[in-house]
Amino acid sequence: MESPALSEFDLHLFAEGRHWHIYNVLGAHLVNHRGTEGTRFAVWAPNARAVSVIGDFNNWDSGRHAMAVNNGYGVWSLFIPGVKAGHLYKFAITTRNGHHITKTDPYGQAFEHRPSNAAVVTERGHYAWGDGDWLERRNRFDWQQSPISVYEVHPGSWRHHGSGRWLTYRELADQLVPYVLETGFTHIELLPVTEHPLDESWGYQTTGYYAPTSRFGSPDDLRYFVDQCHQNNIGVILDWVPGHFPDDDFALAEFDGTALYEHEDPRRGRHQDWGTLIYNYGRHEVRNFLIGSALFWLDTFHMDGLRVDAVASMLYLNYSRNEGEWLPNEHGGHENLDAIRFLQDLNRVCQSRFPGVLMMAEESTSWPRVTRPPEIGGLGFNLKWNMGWMHDTLHYLQQDPVYRQYHHDKLTFGLLYAFSENFVLPLSHDEVVHGKSSLIQKMPGDDWQQRASLRLLFSYMFSYPGAKLLFMGGEFGQRQEWSERRELDWYLLQYPEHQGLRKLVQDLNGLYRRYPALHRKSFTSEGFEWIDCHDSTQSVISFLRNPGTPEHGPLVIVANFTPIPRHHYRIGVPTGGNWQEIFNSDSTWYGGSNLGNPLLLQAEPTPWMARPCSVELTVPPLGLVMLRPAT
């Protein structure tokens, strides 16, 4: 059967790894061929002996619709009249060894509900977007001078319907968007909603890189969710997984009977920790598949950024491997040179084609220049998760306050590297699962001390340099560990103590937006000065946040990490005059004891801590206060 030809130019760009709209070429696309409506199918399978399309339109008969191959590029294609949106399909492949295998479409844009895995022919381009103003503003987004506060969400467990089922994308839009707007976050980060077979993987074992999971609705339902976020001035970041993929036999693994997407040598092609396969980043068509996926989400779903998962596992050939279990690169080193080039290309292409999007790296090592331009040897990300800050801060707060003085360096060490990258401070899903306990349950002491310590943690995060990220449930003190099987413990919000925690996060988000000192210069040392980092005996730290502009004043931050109030605590300040307390994590409004500084603090001409003036204040137990010059 004659097929509408794929252009030589399309195939040439794909073979070079530079076709940035490959999602309009490969896969299944509704077309009109010589006056006949139908669907054109195209798939890359260069080592196959034969490929045919099977589906519910031909009774899954592999003898009905054989595809033709362009031998120069290994792309098989076929036009089938009468196949419409909603029809199910797969590819029946005969390998060069004569084996018969069935695969779903790597470029499929919708799939059946799991455990079924056929792709679904979809019609794209009819959703009526209403976010034009948002996209126009995003093009001018100066993220380095703006507040970035991210609410990390697993869509299947944020909240359930009354019957216990998941909320749909549209129901999430109607419930999650107002909640996030009220709580004050600037962005929602969705754990992977790319299609995946296993609920327990949380989406991190992706099989459909061009399709939103059907668990929560249709592709247009997800577009509605993003659209509603944008119309309420909330950005959407997609958690995206280019580091590995599952070895399910219906998907990418040995797609045409050979190691096509993965590296054929298991010393480079198999991830030992996760039992998954690793992409062959040196292959042009594989790089194009992945970069095309990233662009697909930014283009057709208007995503505002990608959080790239497990970057460290991509960068190191010896990641989680013993001697003899890995192959060195061409120079004898452990760096994955192909993955480095892939990440540089990914960031360069995404940021040039979609100005204002955020590319975030979850990179857990000290790999240099993750957030520096490729032109100077960097990977080109905008932001990197600060895993060191997270580990040190949680380790410190898990100590009994009596012993925190011996771990004071956990608070101070991070400032030695805080501006070496553009950092996000992540209190993510990874910290509240697998026996790690919830954030509030990590805190020692009785219930009051646990809540005070959690308020202190959030206050410290919002006053510390860097973008912010908080996993759902933390904002109101979820006590159970997170599980993808159940919704959050929303009943806790009937109690004033948990209402207070959420009010605290609301107000911290408000302060973060309102005061330039907290969000400008967050990625440069100009925005931070220690006042006193040496008071380990009392477990108190104090520092300045500077906005870098004369029209906006600095903020003074003082934090007490013990349950002992610090009365008449003297700190140096940069100017004389009156200072005003604008925030106190111990306020009764948040469930605290209301110990603080209700009156103006008069700076005295007493030099202190290399500052020309000083003030005496009360620092509440397990509390943090913010001061600003009184006007």
Curated annotation (Swiss-Prot):
Enzyme Commission number(s) from the entry: 2.4.1.18
Keyword Glycosyltransferase carried by entry: yes
Top-rank lineage group of the source organism: Bacteria
One GO cellular component, as annotated: cytosol
Record-linked Gene3D superfamilies: Glycosidases, Golgi alpha-mannosidase II, Immunoglobulins
GO biological process, one term: glycogen biosynthetic process
Pfam family for this entry, one: Alpha-amylase
Active site per database record: D309, E362
UniProt enzyme class: transferase
Keywords: Carbohydrate metabolism, Glycogen biosynthesis, Glycogen metabolism, Glycosyltransferase, Transferase
Reactions accelerated catalytically: Transfers a segment of a (1->4)-alpha-D-glucan chain to a primary hydroxy group in a similar glucan chain
GO MF annotation terms: 1,4-alpha-glucan branching enzyme activity; cation binding; hydrolase activity, hydrolyzing O-glycosyl compounds
Pathway: Glycan biosynthesis; glycogen biosynthesis
Assembly mode: Monomer.
HAMAP family for the chain: GlgB (MF_00685)
Biological role: Catalyzes the formation of the alpha-1,6-glucosidic linkages in glycogen by scission of a 1,4-alpha-linked oligosaccharide from growing alpha-1,4-glucan chains and the subsequent attachment of the oligosaccharide to the alpha-1,6 position.
Membership in a protein family: Belongs to the glycosyl hydrolase 13 family. GlgB subfamily.
Name of the protein this chain belongs to: 1,4-alpha-glucan branching enzyme GlgB
Provenance organism: Marinobacter nauticus (strain ATCC 700491 / DSM 11845 / VT8)
Gene that encodes the chain: glgB
